[in-house]
């Protein structure tokens, strides 16, 4: 559970409760064991909740007309995470790019969240044997020319 409080937005780092248990455990691991900042852990948490919503919609676990933000990200177990394929990840990246309008850098960060989560499930807690994100590379970033001050 995050102990960081943002005085301007007190609910931002509230205890991580509206996600699947594996995600909650992973976010706690990030903060306590991996030493990530509260902001980093919170961003990974949001990314993984978004992926949970996407997968619930993709697998038909919610009505097709359900509003994306209204999909409950809870209720997914370790067996569900083990059923995710590389194609599911590719579809999620496509969704982020086309439907959500994410830039390549945002898509890459969300993919990094998934890489970390699956690395945790496979290598840290040994709950899964396969990582569907292992062979997926982040999108190629646009080269930005430096802006010189005159």
Segments predicted by a language model, with ranges:
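A detector for short, charged/polar N-terminal pre-domain segments
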Residues: 14-18
């Amino acid at each position: 559970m995050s102990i960081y409080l943002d005085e301007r937005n007190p609910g931002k780092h509230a205890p991580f409760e509206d996600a699947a248990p594996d995600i909650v455990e992973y976010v706690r691991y990030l903060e306590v064991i991996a030493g990530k900042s509260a902001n980093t852990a919170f961003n990974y948490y949001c990314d993984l909740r978004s992926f949970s919503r996407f997968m619930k919609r993709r697998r038909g676990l919610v009505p097709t007309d359900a509003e994306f933000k209204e999909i409950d990200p809870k209720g997914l177990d370790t067996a569900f995470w083990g059923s995710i394929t590389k194609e599911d990840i590719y579809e999620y990246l496509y969704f982020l790019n086309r439907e959500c309008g994410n830039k390549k850098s945002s898509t890459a960060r969300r993919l990094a969240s998934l890489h970390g989560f699956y690395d945790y499930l496979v290598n840290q807690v040994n709950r899964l044997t396969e990582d569907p994100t292992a062979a997926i590379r982040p999108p190629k970033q646009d080269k930005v020319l430096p802006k010189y001050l005159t």
